[in-house]
Amino acid sequence: MGQTITTPLSLTLEHWRDVQCIASNQSVDVKRRRWVTFCSVEWPSFDVGWPLDGTFNLDIILQVKSKVFCPGPHGHPDQVPYIVTWEALAYHPPPWVKPFVSPKPFPLSTLPFSPPGPSAHPPSRSDLYTALIPSIKTKPPKSRVLPTNGGPLIDLLTENPPNLGEQGPPLPKGPVKKRRPPPPRYSPPGPMVSRLRGNRDPPAADSTTSRAFPLRLGGNGQLQYWPFSSSDLYNWKNNNPSFSEDPGKLTALIESVLTTHQPTWDDCQQLLGTLLTGEEKQRVLLEARKAVRGNDGRPTQLPNEVNSAFPLERPDWDYTTPEGRNHLVLYRQLLLAGLQNAGRSPTNLAKVKGITQGPSESPSAFLERLKEAYRRYTPYDPEDPGQETNVSMSFIWQSAPDIGRKLERLEDLKSKTLGDLVREAEKIFNKRETPEEREERIRRETEEKEERRRAEDEQREKERDRRRHREMSKFLATVVTGQRQDRQGGERRRPQLDKDQCAYCKEKGHWAKDCPKKPRGPRGPRPQTSLLTLGD
């Protein structure tokens, strides 16, 4: 009552600081949340027997590792640090892991034969490690069929089968004593150019689990060669763009191969010859030799120092010695620097200006594309503080129109850092209307526009009707007035006169003022009009 079951996953979480230290010793970094996700969700889906609570079984760990390291689109590079740390916990278990780790099988030749003893007592229910203690059942003794004369046994893994036509000596009569067969012999591979790995113990003879991981290590404690498989090289070449098309992606692939496989000098040449063209390879090697630094830490052009650090001919580096491994580490670092420098195209600012933010692209993703364009098409490093102003201006001008306009109107824009601009752009981007909201707004604006147009049409029609009504009213008024005048006789119009016709006598030759028939006497006084008064 009250006890909790301890599992490998919960145990690692309880000792998380130790796990991080072990990961740091492996030159990797692990996160707690992703550790739990990979252990309980991702790796059980590989169908190699990984339990949801984790395990320290090396066979299962190695099969998961083979899935993680699978080249091409089926691999999981993001899970490499985590499975490598699990493997380190199983190979070199700390004290808190040892109770969960099954003891390594001893060589069969050193195990003395003993008859099966009585069954051990069953574990109690309160034991926290009951899952790790195998149940031992009493088995009936088997018939002994092997001879007791110490005759040689044939190792079917290393020896040829006997001739069926020959018959061996007759078996002696009497009780037969059982003997164990000798352990299988593991012949180390030949000196083939390939990856470097430390040796591990050979698999147990009774193990039926197949290890899909291609790197098997001997038990002599020496580093051995294991070649790149042709399928690996084929997948790497066909599943990735060429170096000229996308140098960044191919450089990232080669960097992961250099980190995880630790290739030798010959391996690197094979890798470059497969993934690069001849011209690309020469450019990479030239840039790598330029990156060699002297004792003062500055780039050097001394042939002896350059050839010592990055030789073009096959060196005699012994990978089994610390000095040889240090040479290989430096060579791989210089090769990676050469890939990065050779991947830069000639300066082309037009390519940088052509990088614009997509309609649904986040500002962070757009900034990464912009920085990649700076690295690829310019000699400038976008992470350099001296180039922050140029990158910021490009970020503002080449952002989406709505984001760029609002960024330009920010107060105190000169004091804003690139990080501040990205945060402001993220706020603007997150406040954008959704496609549904945009469709609704467009529909609403269209309806309002149609309503305004309809109202304007109605207003124009009413104005046209009023104007037509006024004109019709004037016309009708004129017609009615003319008809009324016709009924009343109308006004008598004066007859038309000629230019020299008198208006008084109607004779021609003089005007009315000179008409002799017109009386000339003074006019009589007009009679005064009498006004009525109050007295009248």
Swiss-Prot record:
Q: Where exactly is the site Cleavage? A: 129-130, 213-214, 476-477
GO CC annotations on file? host cell plasma membrane; membrane; viral nucleocapsid
BP terms from Gene Ontology? virion assembly
Give residue ranges of zinc fingers (CCHC-type).
500-517
Q: Name one GO molecular function term.
A: structural constituent of virion
Q: Where is the composition biased (Basic and acidic residues)?
A: 432-464, 484-517
**Ranges in a coiled coil:** 436-474
Which residues, per the entry, are lipid-modified as N-myristoyl glycine? 2
Annotated segments matching region Disordered? 139-216, 432-536
Keyword match Flavoprotein: no
Q: Does the keyword Cytoplasm apply?
A: no
The record's InterPro entries line, in alphabetical order, gives: G_retro_matrix, G_retro_matrix_sf, Gag_p12, Gag_P30, Retrov_capsid_N, Retroviral_Gag-Pol_poly, Retrovr_matrix, Znf_CCHC
Sorted alphabetically, which SMART domains does this protein's record hold?
ZnF_C2HC
Q: Where is this motif: PPXY motif?
A: 183-186
Instruction: Could you list this entry's UniProt keywords, alphabetically sorted.
Output: Capsid protein, Coiled coil, Host cell membrane, Host membrane, Lipoprotein, Membrane, Metal-binding, Myristate, Phosphoprotein, RNA-binding, Viral matrix protein, Viral nucleoprotein, Virion, Zinc, Zinc-finger
Protein name as it appears in the record:
Gag polyprotein
Q: Please name the source species.
A: Murine leukemia virus (strain DEF27)
